Amino acid sequence: MWTPELAILRGFPTEAERQQWKQEGVVGSESGSFLQLLLEGNYEAIFLNSMTQNIFNSTTTAEEKIDSYLEKQVVTFLDYSTDLDTTERQQLIFLLGVSSLQLFVQSNWTGPPVDLHPQDFLSSVLFQQFSEVKGLDAFVLSLLTLDGESIYSLTSKPILLLLARIILVNVRHKLTAIQSLPWWTLRCVNIHQHLLEERSPLLFTLAENCIDQVMKLQNLFVDDSGRYLAIQFHLECAYVFLYYYEYRKAKDQLDIAKDISQLQIDLTGALGKRTRFQENYVAQLILDVRREGDVLSNCEFTPAPTPQEHLTKNLELNDDTILNDIKLADCEQFQMPDLCAEEIAIILGICTNFQKNNPVHTLTEVELLAFTSCLLSQPKFWAIQTSALILRTKLEKGSTRRVERAMRQTQALADQFEDKTTSVLERLKIFYCCQVPPHWAIQRQLASLLFELGCTSSALQIFEKLEMWEDVVICYERAGQHGKAEEILRQELEKKETPSLYCLLGDVLGDHSCYDKAWELSRYRSARAQRSKALLHLRNKEFQECVECFERSVKINPMQLGVWFSLGCAYLALEDYQGSAKAFQRCVTLEPDNAEAWNNLSTSYIRLKQKVKAFRTLQEALKCNYEHWQIWENYILTSTDVGEFSEAIKAYHRLLDLRDKYKDVQVLKILVRAVIDGMTDRSGDVATGLKGKLQELFGRVTSRVTNDGEIWRLYAHVYGNGQSEKPDENEKAFQCLSKAYKCDTQSNCWEKDITSFKEVVQRALGLAHVAIKCSKNKSSSQEAVQMLSSVRLNLRGLLSKAKQLFTDVATGEMSRELADDITAMDTLVTELQDLSNQFRNQY
């Protein structure tokens, strides 16, 4: 490995490394001068260096494409230059590639603005085909388009990213002397991805390859220096995986970084005060950070903290009630250790992962604010401070007492880009271990906040300056100025026709011809054009055309999560369940935590009669969203279908948690039959063993739903319907049947219909027989008499109603249909009376 590679990755050399370079003669070489400028953060000087000028000032034709020219010049220098040896040529080109990337990041992410122009280091012949620099930028942006996804139109100095990509990606196979190159390729890929509208499968594949290559570098992560770099690498990998929906892999990478650092990070409760006038300390949620070891004690390998005056100021809340920070009752108990850059970055990474894996909810916001409070309590690094403040402003904008600070803080974050007091070297410390958004994204956040607060004109001013026409259109549309939105887009199209502008015009007008024009302009490569056209078909319920457009879009870029989901829905509408299953399968592959996609996938499997697959997919859906009652309802039905009776009981309990009066009599019938008949479940176990759990479930159900006779009868059935050998079970069955009878007789019109009347009579007779059996096991004769008397009264009431309602007025005779029932009731009333008398004689 070339000696300075670790320092370049780290962003600074140690004193020992400086001495080693002097001894090895690194400093005096051509690459040594580049190295010194790079480590000083003087990236522009590298491009103004005579060596760089010589590489790129070769003869060319005006017709030659700029990317071809740049790559040709780099390859020519690497292969044919005789002034330097092969290794040093590779080192120079590598340093040029890293400088290009760093300068591009400075120009678009960190600031301050870059003064370098392409004309400063490239041949003037290259610019003859462009009337102005904007024309060159637009052409370069088109070269950086991938998988049909365009790049933000006002990206600054895109030529720098193009050059970085040529060196770190296209010709990386020629830089064999640089072992750490795959890591820089990964960084270049990550920066490129964040400029695209959607995730690029090409970039993700390249990122995965880079990660694998870095993992194989044995000597990169050894000794104390390697430990710090290992943490940085695993954090960078975690952010890559998070962005591409690989949440499990991201968590694994974060866990590795945390294990290396030996940090213990926990959300916990502590007594404290939040308001100025609070008298008592109450439990507050805080982040407790502790070191379990001292593995990161060698501070020469970690970046030195930036002076606070050079960091974005953490603005005060200035509220007359709420304190700026929680005032803890015992500050020393939760005293946080003095953390290094990598340790703070781990906390930020865990916070970001937590945010991605939890629903938007008040509790989640409170937990995230505990993370931001912790991060901001040790202001040391520009990238971490900026990331934490951006997250806090997003969390605070919904609070009436905090929105004013959120507004001021976002403005301060937007303004810091132009501020030249903080050097780029300070801003780039630990930069790649954080997800700092580009500076225009912060300005967009400011404009969005202004719009939400009702400052529409100020928001529009920022959006128009940023040329974020989609946001401009949304502003006008929400303000009801539909004509103005169309006017703005047509004005921009007169200046230059682009696929994205035609797509936006199509969104405003709902006109397919606009999307067709965008598709044509993109040379049939715009995933956005087909995506937008499909969505219009979807709104118009033209599902067949919708499916065709979505399929074209995902063929260009298969990483469009939202498109796969909408495609699945369109296939469901067409009743093409094979198609919907395929689409939702791709959805959950991209985002394994998408509960709705899992649920819809199970629906597709159910329609395809693949019930076991449906059951498994619903299990995955519930892992993602435990609160979604519709998923639980699908789960309970599928569980009973496939014979997972234990899971069905568990699901019924959960539905009772989520919906207080939930009932599904059909499911309860299946469960009762399974338990009583001793059916085998999917695993081959006999369901009789679930009797206790089913009784417990019925106890909960009947405590919530008290007026359903069918449920009470099923409950009695679980206890043997009064025919059990256990007296206590017969007693319980009698109680359930009594309540069922009460529900039956309280319902409307049962006595006016002879069929319904006969059903009630049969239930009353059955209840009477159970009462007779139970009475014989009563220890108290008085209780036995009460039981028999209640059922005898039921029968007498029915006899009375029968005579009243079903006697022929002309003949005075009872309906023949009830003759047997009347006889049975009369006989049973007599038997009950005799048995009651026997018990009375025992008093």
From Swiss-Prot:
UniProt-listed SMART domains: TPR
TPR repeats (start-end): 453-486, 492-525, 527-560, 561-594, 596-628, 629-662
Domain of life: Eukaryota
Signal peptide: none
Keyword Repeat: yes
Pfam families noted in UniProt: TPR_16
Protein family per UniProt: Belongs to the TTC27 family.
Protein name per UniProt: Tetratricopeptide repeat protein 27
Organism: Homo sapiens (Human)
